[in-house]
A protein has these predicted regions:
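Long, charge-rich, low-complexity intrinsically disordered regions
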Residues: 1-28, 32, 37-212
Length: 212
C-alpha cells in the first residue's frame, strides 16, 4: 500500500510539473502573439485556462483571425519567402533537441526576430512554415546559382532560391553592378551609369547618330 501511495504521489508530482511547464509555454506563446486556439493546441491546456491568461498578460482578449491553410501569402513577396526559409532553418536546428513543440516554436520565433531587422512573419505565419513541408506543398531543393538548399514550391524550369532572387533583383541587368534598394516605387533595372549611357544612345539615334 505504501509503495502504491508513493507511486501515486510521484505521478501527481509529474502531472504538476507538466502542467506548470505548459502554463509557462502558454505565457510565452501569448506574449509572442499566439491566438488562443494555437496555444491550446500546442500546450494541451483547456480553452478556459488559456483565455484567462490574455487579459493579465496583454490587457486584451485573444487575437481573432484564421490559421493560414495555403502558401499564397508567402509567394506574393520574395522577401516573405526568404524569411520563411530563415524560419525553416531554425526549426531544423531546434527540432533535433528534446523539446516540446511549443518550446521549439517559442525559441524559433525569438531567434528569428533577433536575426532579421524587420520581421515579416508573425508567430502564426512562422508556425505554418514546417507544415507546408509536411503536407508537401513545399520541397527542399538546390538553387541553380548558389547550390544552397531552400524550401518552396517545385520549380518546373530551373531553381533559384529567394536569397539569389533578392540578389539579382538589385543588380543592374546590363553590367551586374549593385543597385540601391528602393522600399517604394518601381524597382530600377539599370544602375545610374548604364541608365545614362542608354539615354545618350537613344539621343544619338534620335538625331541620326549625331550626339547633341
Amino acid at each position: 500500500i505504501a509503495r502504491k501511495e508513493s507511486n501515486t504521489k510521484v505521478l501527481s508530482n509529474i502531472d504538476a510539473v507538466n502542467q506548470a511547464r505548459s502554463m509557462v509555454e502558454a505565457v510565452h506563446l501569448i506574449q509572442l502573439g499566439a491566438r488562443a486556439s494555437m496555444v491550446c493546441q500546442l500546450t494541451g491546456l483547456n480553452k478556459n485556462i488559456v483565455s484567462g491568461l490574455y487579459q493579465p498578460l496583454t490587457g486584451m482578449p485573444s487575437p481573432s483571425g484564421q490559421v493560414p491553410f495555403t502558401d499564397t501569402w508567402y509567394l506574393k513577396n520574395n522577401r516573405r519567402l526568404l524569411h520563411a526559409n530563415v524560419v525553416w532553418r531554425l526549426f531544423q536546428q531546434l527540432e533535433r533537441m528534446e523539446r516540446t513543440v511549443a518550446n521549439v516554436l517559442v525559441h524559433v520565433y525569438k531567434a528569428y526576430v533577433e536575426i532579421v531587422d524587420t520581421p515579416l512573419l508573425n508567430l502564426t505565419r512562422a508556425s505554418f512554415v514546417p507544415r507546408l513541408v509536411r503536407i508537401k506543398a513545399w520541397y527542399e531543393q538546390a538553387c541553380d546559382h548558389c547550390g544552397m538548399t531552400y524550401i518552396g514550391p517545385l520549380e518546373k524550369s530551373g531553381s533559384i532560391c529567394p536569397a539569389c532572387t533578392e540578389y539579382f533583383n538589385y543588380r543592374c541587368r546590363s553590367c551586374g553592378a549593385a543597385i540601391e534598394y528602393r522600399p517604394t516605387g518601381r524597382r530600377k533595372m539599370l544602375c545610374t551609369d548604364c541608365y545614362e549611357r542608354q539615354k545618350r544612345s537613344k539621343r544619338r539615334l534620335a538625331h541620326g547618330g549625331i550626339d547633341g
